[in-house]
């Protein structure tokens, strides 16, 4: 599991006015909550978070939050608020992580070997990814940044379901898998081209 460090400082002033001043200074108001400790208000460097939030790992990995240069605190991103039209992160929520408590996290799917699969090499075939992430349950030490879905044997007309995915050891779906919840993940099918040319009416062009 990769180590992703985020630097932060404790925040003394709270409220809308204080948050507005922070943003003008290039900082982001944020909070850490969860566990047996009280919530802690912190501030983050906007540039650091703006770059981090463009990466997949920021949303699905355990983050090492370094507050005031002290020891890192293990957290998960739980909420990130963006400005509706400006390139600004407005607020961030982090949840503390306990090493012995299972997490429920959305983990992205990475599809491999699609181009070399029988369906990928066939002409006139569309391969659709119905899901791009799955919610899993696991201990923090077992949390993967992503789960690979191998499409090397995908053939035309084939559907890959959740039950076909191989999950890492210690990782399982958050919801119980049965026939009703065994969702399609990938579908490979031929493209159907409809003929939109209007049929000629009977007798059209006939001369009397």
UniProtKB/Swiss-Prot annotation:
Highest rank taxon of the organism: Bacteria
GO cellular component, one term: cytosolic large ribosomal subunit
Gene3D superfamilies named in the record: Ribosomal protein L25, beta domain, Ribosomal Protein L25, Chain P
SUPFAM superfamilies xrefs: Ribosomal protein L25-like (SSF50715)
Annotated InterPro entries: Rbsml_bL25/Gln-tRNA_synth_N, Ribosomal_bL25/Gln-tRNA_synth, Ribosomal_bL25_b-dom, Ribosomal_bL25_C, Ribosomal_bL25_long, Ribosomal_bL25_short, Ribosomal_L25_dom, Ribosomal_uL5_bac-type
GO terms of molecular function: 5S rRNA binding; structural constituent of ribosome
Keyword Ribosomal protein part of the UniProt annotation: yes
One Pfam family here: Ribosomal_TL5_C
rRNA-binding recorded as keyword: yes
Subunit structure of this chain's protein: Part of the 50S ribosomal subunit; part of the 5S rRNA/L5/L18/L25 subcomplex. Contacts the 5S rRNA. Binds to the 5S rRNA independently of L5 and L18.
Function: This is one of the proteins that binds to the 5S RNA in the ribosome where it forms part of the central protuberance.
Name of the protein described by the UniProt record: Large ribosomal subunit protein bL25
